Every structure is written in C-alpha cells, then in structure tokens.
C-alpha cells in the first residue's frame, strides 16, 4: 500500500521521507557532467564554469534528468571551490543552485561538493568540504 496521496499532493519532503522510511528507492539524477559533455563540454574543462558561461546547457541537462524521473537534482558544483575558482566559487555555487531550482522546481535539490585542497592534507580536505557544505546548504535553503 502506498503512503502517497494520489497525484503526488504530499509535500516533497514528506514524499521523500515516506519512501525512505519504507526502504524504497529515491531517484537521484546522475550524469550531469556526462550530459554537459554530450552538449559540447570538452574533456578536461571544469563543468562548474558552465553555470556562468553556458547556463542554458546546464538547464537543459537538469530538465532532461528531471523529466526522466529524478526526484533529487544535484547542483553542478562538485569542483566549485575557492582553491580552483577563487572569489568566483561563490557565484558558481549560487548559479548552480538557481539553475537546478529553475530546471526542476518539483525536485529536491542536493548540493554536490567534491574534494577541496590537496588529498595529502586530509584535515584540510574535510574541513574544506564541511565549509563548502555549510555554504551550499545556506544557498539551497534560501
């Protein structure tokens, strides 16, 4: 028996919580970068920059993944850190959240955060990720 109201009228958080409580699958998008490659992102070029340089391509990928059934859409921000982008990292993160929200208004938004700093500096790596996670969480909530 489904815990969902016909037509999906429960709020998104309730729908996702009910699925998780029932140990059901929640569909999370995948392949944002693959989608960008299909639209012309050259191998080796950071995909996060397209949030500012080619936002229409990021929107197209997110819309396609949402149309395919993704209930959770990840931001195109996995490498958007101050080490790589300096002051532009904040603008990229903000744009990645905005684009995901525009493209998939009925989906939950999850921030994608990759490694920061050197893999040899483990303490900084996790501290940097925690800082980035907190910043991205604020952007998603606001």
Which residue ranges define each predicted feature?
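Domain-level signal for soluble alpha/beta catalytic cores
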Residues: 1-142
């Amino acid at each position: 028996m489904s815990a969902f109201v016909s037509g999906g009228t429960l709020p998104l958080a309730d729908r996702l919580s009910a699925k998780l409580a029932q140990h059901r699958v929640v569909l999370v998008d995948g392949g944002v970068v693959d989608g960008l490659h299909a639209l012309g992102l050259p191998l080796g070029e950071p995909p996060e920059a397209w949030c500012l340089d080619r936002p229409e391509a990021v929107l197209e990928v997110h819309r396609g993944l949402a149309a395919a059934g993704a209930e959770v859409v990840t931001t195109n921000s996995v490498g958007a850190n101050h080490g790589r982008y300096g002051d532009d990292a904040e603008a990229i993160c903000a744009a990645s959240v905005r684009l995901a929200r525009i493209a998939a208004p009925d989906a939950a938004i999850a921030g994608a955060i990759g490694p920061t700093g050197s893999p040899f500096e483990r303490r900084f790596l996790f501290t940097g990720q925690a800082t980035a996670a907190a910043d991205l969480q604020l952007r998603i909530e606001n």
